Amino acid sequence: MKKIPRIGVGGPVGSGKTAIIEAVVPILIKLGYRILVITNDIVTTEDAKHVQRTLKGVLIEDRIVGVETGGCPHTAVREDPSMNLAAVEEMEAKFPDTDLVLLESGGDNLTLTFSPALIDFFIYVIDVAAGDKIPRKNGPGISQSDILVINKTDLAPYVGASLQVMDDDSRMMRGKKPFVFTNCKTNEGIDDLVHLIRENVLFDTEVSKESA
């Protein structure tokens, strides 16, 4: 069976992890990729149901599954990812034609990381509403994720946050690692995020042609 790349999508509660997934999946599907989505919640499968409703007619429900972790979000994706590994392996066996798995963690804090046994690539999502100080607070999600997503840019004027400060601090904390500003209501930055996924995870040769 082919090795299917897996992206872990993590971040604090309410940062927009589910919205990011719901924004990128239709674009990836339109480009011809076959996707699986696995979400984590502590005592429900609400995120999975939300994705199923939002992507109805775009991604069949059977390709979206929720995992009830019953405990700390980071435990289920880092210290003991066995439930998620079982879910991923079951879904990959059911849909062997899959090109990409998107695995959303439960909402956690800036220390969230994923077990390398579970994912190949890490996207960390923060939101502007939490304040422009978040990037300089650092943490593994800020500095070590493969892509940092700074979501909800439209809220900056309402919370007194400076996008320029967040940009400067993200560059300082991440060095050359990519980050992208997004607004899921307008799709601002979503094409850029999809481009990074195609280039760095799916190794799509068409991306370099498009950039030329």
Curated annotation (Swiss-Prot):
Regions that span the bilayer: none
Keyword field: Chaperone, Cytoplasm, GTP-binding, Nickel insertion, Nucleotide-binding
Coiled coil regions in record: none
Matches recorded under CDD domains: UreG
SUPFAM superfamilies, A to Z: P-loop containing nucleoside triphosphate hydrolases
Cellular compartment(s): Cytoplasm
Keyword Disulfide bond: no
One Gene Ontology MF term: GTPase activity
Function: Facilitates the functional incorporation of the urease nickel metallocenter. This process requires GTP hydrolysis, probably effectuated by UreG.
NCBIfam families according to UniProt: ureG
Subunit annotation: Homodimer. UreD, UreF and UreG form a complex that acts as a GTP-hydrolysis-dependent molecular chaperone, activating the urease apoprotein by helping to assemble the nickel containing metallocenter of UreC. The UreE protein probably delivers the nickel.
Name assigned to this protein: Urease accessory protein UreG 2
Species, as recorded: Brucella canis (strain ATCC 23365 / NCTC 10854 / RM-666)
